[in-house]
Amino acid sequence: MIPVVALVGRPNVGKSTLFNRLTRTRDALVADFPGLTRDRKYGRAFLSGYEFIVVDTGGIDGTEEGIETKMAEQSLAAIEEADVVLFMTDARAGLTAADLSIAQHLRSRQKTTFVVANKIDGIDADSACAEFWSLGLGEVYQMAAAQGRGVTNMIEYALTPYAEAMGIERQGEEEEVDERQYTEEEAEAEQKRLQDLPIKLAIIGKPNVGKSTLTNRILGEERVVVYDEPGTTRDSIYIPMERDGREYVIIDTAGVRRRSKVHEVIEKFSVIKTLKAVEDANVVLLIIDAREGVAEQDLGLLGFALNAGRALVIAVNKWDGIDQGIKDRVKSELDRRLGFIDFARIHFISALHGTGVGHLFESIEEAYDSATRRVSTSMLTRIMQMSQDDHQPPLVNGRRVKLKYAHAGGYNPPIVVIHGNQVSKLPDSYKRYMMNYFRRSLKVVGTPIQLRFQEGDNPFENKVEKLTMSQERRRKRALSHIKDRKTK
């Protein structure tokens, strides 16, 4: 499971600066969730080979009263759910009462914590950082987040204990990043193997949208004995089930928790828990409340799923009991605001009464099969050639862009790598045309498809040709002949 790093500290110590630097390293999707909290941000980051979720917390002013306020609860929740806490302080301002208060709270939680003395640029860092040892949280790490000094070393040190686990996880997900070039027979055999694997389904949505109701409806219909292994208080519940001969694992993010161990605010909605579920899933089922329409939180969650490249099914819940005028308005809003994901199936359901729930699994299975389908190199190259025959690539500087061959570059989501000359100069309109052509030809439904173009560089370009011995002799005779003619 991908580790979570929480940035904790009093206001203006550089949490947001570090957050922005970390998330920029991978063009990561960064989303604020209006209505959830105004001072907590989430992003995916990649640095020095480590992939992780980073959380920018806020709202802790360090006072005893401030720790207990509603405003601070979401930040405290981030600490509870994090694997690693970076406790950030201001080396220029020195140790404050707020720092001491936050440190006391962190010690009581017994979290893996690293004290970071930020803003060390232009000062005597060793001298300025000495007093932070009194926080009682171990070694003090020096950093200048704005300039990037010390950031990489800090992350490498903090995430080293997770390196082996992440390596094992990547091996376990080998089928999702498989770049082998299959023959027709190999692709068919691999596809058959994948049919026997359980489909991991994450059910996500904003608070009170009906996640628990839908989960219970699904399990009740199938009469499956549910077992859970909660582990720590931040783990989602994995529920195995079978439907129509196909095995599934439902990743429940609805908030099944040991209530005595966590804040009530965590029960309702945990973005971190949702992010982890999305990362671990094959297919994401996003639930939208029909009575509220498409909210900003829905778009934020949708962005997380798309950023992770997961197959997607959308369920509009609470469809029963609303009049036709509202239904027409909701459908119009879905077309307008979700037009960019026209590949995803949309279902209108009632989780409470079971209306339309059964049809969800047809789309879930369809999306999984599309996302994990193995396609041979010869098939992809044929489709690429047909797309060119139907619509020639444009001319660039008087020369036609030439596409040579295509092969698979990964799965979940499907990635097609196309090799050719001058492909970097292809206009976006032609790339979209090709993407849609591949989608129609492969009948890809419920998952984004990505095209990557690689330039077929001339291996002899800028290379001095080495002559053979016979060529060298002919060259000398020719030069001698030219020289003799000039002297006559």
Swiss-Prot record:
Domain KH-like: residue ranges: 373-457
UniProt cross-references to PROSITE patterns, sorted A to Z: G_ENGA (PS51712)
Domain EngA-type G: 3-166, 199-372
Source taxon at top rank: Bacteria
Function: GTPase that plays an essential role in the late steps of ribosome biogenesis.
Name the UniProt record assigns to this protein: GTPase Der
Entry-linked CDD domains: EngA1, EngA2
Species the sequence originates in: Shewanella sp. (strain MR-7)
Similarity comment: family membership: Belongs to the TRAFAC class TrmE-Era-EngA-EngB-Septin-like GTPase superfamily. EngA (Der) GTPase family.
Assembly and oligomerization: Associates with the 50S ribosomal subunit.
GO molecular function: GTP binding; ribosome binding
